């Protein structure tokens, strides 16, 4: 690949990828974390033109794994893990701190070279999405996993759309299982099939150490992943250009400098959130909001900082989501600065001080749903939708504070997310009970609470403690049925007399067309809650009727 760093040979790169795979196995990292880390490393190597030495290559590989783990894992790799993996173990704490500081500088240089854009839609992520949608049997799973990782043995995967490669891998698995005689006909059909076969064949015969490492992470034998003996033409040409997955909008975001942030007057504090404080400042003669996120650990950039900047960049441009103006991480103070739209107030404060007209209520509700629908369409769940994190300026509503937001995988319930998310009055029942893995439907529950609050001016589930909120939910919605929730856990958590049917929320009686939809959004069973697109459609229709 012409664009790739000429000093990093195929064998050098493959050695790094093989090591990253073994580290991922030892630390039990997700497959998506590993694949994303390889994407980050390859993207970085596309950006640099110097020759890294062996030590720098090792540092880059493990730090790319660390960055990826901060995005994808509950328990990411820490700097102590990096020191261990690089075999740096001095008993001198002072020396360790110096080396850690140097590694933090390298990590920061990787992030800055990539403009902090480190979210990737990997081949494996798409395979998992397609798997769930097509309800495929498990016997194809391990071969698909193997092929997804085998394609990382060279950097040629960068030339192709990962979504298309994922689809082709699944088709190959199906054909080999159900009608292997059709395999040759299949791979002659399209370039992506030919590419997969060629890399598979090369890995099987030439990259044996890596091939065996991939197989060792599955339940398959080497024979079961043997490449079919099909000869393809040697004249097959891959695309010359790098395929660009459109995750981020076509917009350049300002990276502030140390000089810039040192000049800012941080006297006018607007408020504090989960992960930082927000100030009203003047930048380039314009008034904006500046969020300061401070990490308690010296030098180290925090996972929430990386997530928030990436989430904001991906969602930038939507009229009902707070816009990012720029960002900067100052390593000496361990502080991330994020420039944002300046809004007037939060929805929480606005509702206490204003009587909102019915027309404005409708506007706010629709804008909220438009924003959540867009956010979910980009594969991001907010995980902290509350009246304090919804911002108002005149008749415009915007969702803010993306410090807790993260990518989700389709509609499947995922066990590998942090449980302690969402403000307590907007927290979905599965989170309150601690009995479900969860997905983006926790946002739908929070949205149902917010719509109720906008329409009635009152919180539907008010309480200071979890037990109070659970009891309030029970009073209004009644007891969950056995299909929706584990009753023994519900009983132990609620500790209240049971009634089969709740009393409903009487202020919603003024909105007979909307409250059935809101109660669907508040279904105990997340699978029964409508998605954001359906909520938006139903609410629009209810206001028009």
Curated annotation (Swiss-Prot):
Keyword Transferase among record annotations: yes
Annotated EC: 2.7.11.1
Catalytic activity: L-seryl-[protein] + ATP = O-phospho-L-seryl-[protein] + ADP + H(+); L-threonyl-[protein] + ATP = O-phospho-L-threonyl-[protein] + ADP + H(+)
Active site: 384
Record protein name field: Putative serine/threonine-protein kinase L673
Residue intervals of the Protein kinase domain: 264-543
Domain Cyclin N-terminal: 13-125
Enzyme's top EC category: transferase
SUPFAM superfamilies in the cross-refs: Cyclin-like (SSF47954), Protein kinase-like (PK-like) (SSF56112)
Alphabetized InterPro entries for the sequence: CDK, Cyclin-like_sf, Cyclin_N, Kinase-like_dom_sf, Prot_kinase_dom, Protein_kinase_ATP_BS, Tyr_kinase_AS
UniProt KW keywords: ATP-binding, Kinase, Nucleotide-binding, Serine/threonine-protein kinase, Transferase
Family per record: Belongs to the protein kinase superfamily. Ser/Thr protein kinase family.
Binding-site list for ATP: 270-278, 291
UniProt GO MF annotations: ATP binding; protein serine kinase activity; protein serine/threonine kinase activity
Pfam families documented for this protein: Cyclin_N, Pkinase
């Amino acid at each position: 690949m012409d664009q790739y760093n000429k000093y990093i040979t195929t064998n050098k790169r493959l050695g790094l990828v093989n090591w990253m795979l073994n580290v991922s196995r030892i630390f039990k990292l997700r497959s998506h974390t590993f694949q994303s880390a390889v994407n980050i490393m390859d993207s970085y190597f596309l950006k640099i033109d110097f020759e890294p030495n062996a030590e720098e290559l090792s540092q880059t590989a493990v730090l790319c794994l660390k960055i990826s783990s901060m995005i994808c894992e509950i328990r990411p790799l820490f700097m102590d893990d990096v020191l261990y993996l690089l075999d740096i173990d001095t008993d001198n704490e002072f020396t360790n701190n110096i080396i850690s500081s140097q590694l933090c500088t390298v990590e920061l240089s990787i992030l800055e070279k990539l403009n902090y854009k480190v979210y990737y839609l990997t081949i494996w992520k798409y395979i998992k999405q397609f798997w769930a949608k097509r309800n495929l049997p498990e016997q194809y799973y391990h071969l698909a996993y193997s092929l997804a990782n085998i394609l990382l043995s060279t950097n040629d995967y960068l030339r192709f759309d990962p979504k298309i490669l994922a689809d082709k891998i699944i088709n190959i698995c199906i054909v080999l299982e159900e009608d292997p005689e059709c395999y040759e006909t299949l791979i002659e059909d399209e370039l992506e099939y030919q590419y997969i076969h060629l890399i598979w064949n090369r890995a099987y015969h030439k990259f044996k150490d890596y091939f065996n490492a991939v197989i060792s992470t599955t339940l398959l034998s080497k024979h079961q992943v043997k490449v079919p003996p099909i000869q393809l033409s040697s004249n097959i040409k891959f695309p010359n250009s790098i395929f660009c997955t459109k995750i981020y909008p076509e917009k350049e975001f300002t990276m502030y400098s140390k000089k810039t942030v040192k000049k800012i007057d941080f006297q006018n504090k607007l408020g504090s959130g989960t992960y930082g404080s927000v100030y009203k400042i003047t930048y380039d003669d314009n008034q904006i909001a500046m969020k300061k996120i401070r990490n308690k650990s010296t030098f180290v950039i925090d996972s929430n900082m990386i997530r928030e900047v990436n989430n904001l960049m991906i969602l930038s441009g939507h009229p009902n989501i707070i816009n990012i103006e720029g960002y900067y991480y100052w390593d000496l103070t361990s502080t991330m600065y994020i420039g944002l739209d300046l809004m007037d107030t939060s929805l929480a404060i606005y509702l206490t001080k204003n009587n909102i007209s019915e027309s404005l209520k409708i506007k706010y509700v629709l804008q909220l749903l438009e924003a959540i629908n867009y956010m979910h369409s980009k594969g991001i769940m907010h995980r902290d939708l509350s009246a304090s994190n919804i911002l108002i300026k005149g008749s415009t509503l915007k969702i803010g504070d993306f410090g807790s937001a993260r990518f989700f995988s389709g509609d499947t319930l995922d066990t590998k997310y942090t449980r302690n998310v969402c403000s307590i009055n907007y927290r979905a029942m599965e989170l309150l009970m601690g009995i479900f893995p969860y997905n983006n439907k926790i946002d739908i529950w929070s949205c149902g609470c917010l719509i109720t609050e906008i329409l009635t001016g009152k919180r539907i589930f008010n309480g200071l403690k979890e037990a109070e909120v659970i009891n309030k939910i029970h009073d209004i919605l009644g007891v969950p049925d056995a299909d929706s929730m584990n009753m023994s856990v519900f009983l132990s958590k609620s500790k209240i007399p049971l009634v089969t049917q709740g009393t409903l929320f009487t202020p919603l009686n003024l909105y007979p067309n909307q409250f059935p939809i809101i109660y669907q959004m508040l279904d105990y069973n997340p699978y029964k809650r409508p998605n954001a697109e359906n909520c938006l459609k139903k609410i629009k229709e209810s206001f028009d009727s």
